[in-house]
Amino acid sequence: MASRTASGQGVAGVIWPPVVHYLNDLIGWRETYFYFGIFVLVTMVPLALLLRHKPVAASANRQHNAASKHGILGLSPNLVHGILCLATIGCCAAMAMPIVHLVSHATDLGFTSARAAELLSLLFGAAFFSRIAFGMLVDRIGGVRTLLIGSGCQAIMLLVFSVVESQIGFYIAAVLFGLGFDGIMPCYALIIRVLFPVTELGWRIAWQYLFAFFGMALGGWLGGAVFDLTGGYSHAFLVGAGFNMMNLALAGFIFVRQNRQGALRQAA
């Protein structure tokens, strides 16, 4: 359910880039932002009111999952959550590089702005299917394994973006990146759901997404800063791949601890 809900982001990514491109050419980017803000205001506020009812309180026997007096994965619960938050910064800083700068990178290589906008639509179109598929994968192999798969795919495609220059190569890379990156974020909510008590899910998931916003902002800014230093985006994508390695290392640590705790429980 989490992945199906989050897949709406992919649909939006298909619809909005060509619309924004058209409005930018017609009325300018400032006016485009203004009218988009009005659209968000008149649609999101009424839709949010549909969710105003408080959820049914969880029963007492559901308020404890993997958490116990021994901590989580043999560590402090807040330490585990901090590791997940840092992992989120790593993956989001990496994914922001192509999301924010792919259009500029393509136009620098000689693509028209319309073709460059198509790349973003292809990327998010693939992302829609990715979230559905990764949601099914989470149900089969768990959130941490799925996170490792998605993060690994994202790292590979960032390396590809740093070297590809042909139109067909960009189209293929955009689709494959979309298939990899967009299944990552729902994994964190599901990992937290498994590791932490139900009564802590709200604030822990909120913090997780706050760090995701920090990561996206960092990646978007850093991509531009690297461009200013090097005159191109290829090195920015390599920097993004480096952040992705940080994510893989932290997620791998959680995976190893989870397996170790599972083995200890079986031995006991």
Feature-to-residue mapping (PLM):
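Helix-loop-helix hairpin linking two adjacent transmembrane segments in secondary transporters
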Residues: T5, Q9-P55
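C-terminal ends and interior cores of transmembrane alpha-helices
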Residues: C153-E165
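A late C-terminal transmembrane helix in Major Facilitator Superfamily
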Residues: L195-G232, G240
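Extracytoplasmic gate region of multi-pass secondary transporters
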Residues: L79-M136
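Helix-to-loop junctions at the C-terminal end of transmembrane segments
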Residues: S130-G142, F227-D228
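Paired small-residue
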Residues: M157, I168-L176
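Intracellular juxtamembrane helix-capping segments at the cytosolic ends
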Residues: M1, G183-F196
